[in-house]
Amino acid sequence: MKILLTNDDGLYSAGLKAAYDALSELGEVFVVAPAVQRSGVGRSLSIMEPIRVSEVKVNGMRVFAVDGTPTDSVIIGMYEVIGEIPDLAVSGINLGENLSTEAATTSGTVGAALEAATHGSKTIAISLQMPDVSKFELTSKADFSFASKVLRGIAEIVLYKGLPEGVDLLNVNVPAKPNGKIAVTRLARRMYRVSVEKRLDPRGREYYWIYGEETEDAEEGTDIHALRQGYVSITPLKIDLTASVEFDIVEGWFDGLEWEV
């Protein structure tokens, strides 16, 4: 079994090492990850600059450090390092949860998983909740022990049973205070109330800082609600973003719209 492992926190992340240890007994693990922190880049791809790759040893792992995005890492991992589509692709373990439709489109962790799934690999994105702390300040203090057990258990099932029909990948979120149970969930619509703060640099020039505060509401059945109740949230995702609507309804919406050419 060949397993591709990547992340968006970079090759020195403790979560990457925890994932590597959890997966090592299940197959040959190829670690191909961004050389530096690339959180929040979504599924972005480097197309305007060359991508350089260095083979290094980090925390006992052989790592291919990619000077690019998590998506770049997936593509290089599949087509250059492994040379074929792996039996399983894992993105994580991310330091900080990736919940709601917001994370599905902005998270580098989920973006890498979407890319891997697009190429036909069974895929898992996995993240660990870090409440009320900064992922950039407390990286070394995170406890990945339970998240590692979760990853091992889910990965073993996916490797040998595959994914249910209609499911392209799993977005797994592990609570900081787990109750030991899983909940299959849907994506919440949003997790944050976004704000923009204007500031001045030392030279008096304006710049902006975008940040968000968590919403208090969380509908039952969503990934946010499950995590807050202590459940490991497993959200089945599909790549096709086409809305579930009868096309004739949409056609009727734009009835009569045409152009002379």
Swiss-Prot record:
A divalent metal cation binds at residues 8-9, 39, 94. Its EC number is 3.1.3.5. Binds 1 divalent metal cation per subunit. GO terms for molecular function: 5'-nucleotidase activity; metal ion binding; nucleotide binding. It catalyses: a ribonucleoside 5'-phosphate + H2O = a ribonucleoside + phosphate. The keyword ATP-binding does not apply. Its main location: cytoplasm. Belongs to the SurE nucleotidase family. This is 5'-nucleotidase SurE. It comes from Archaeoglobus fulgidus (strain ATCC 49558 / DSM 4304 / JCM 9628 / NBRC 100126 / VC-16).
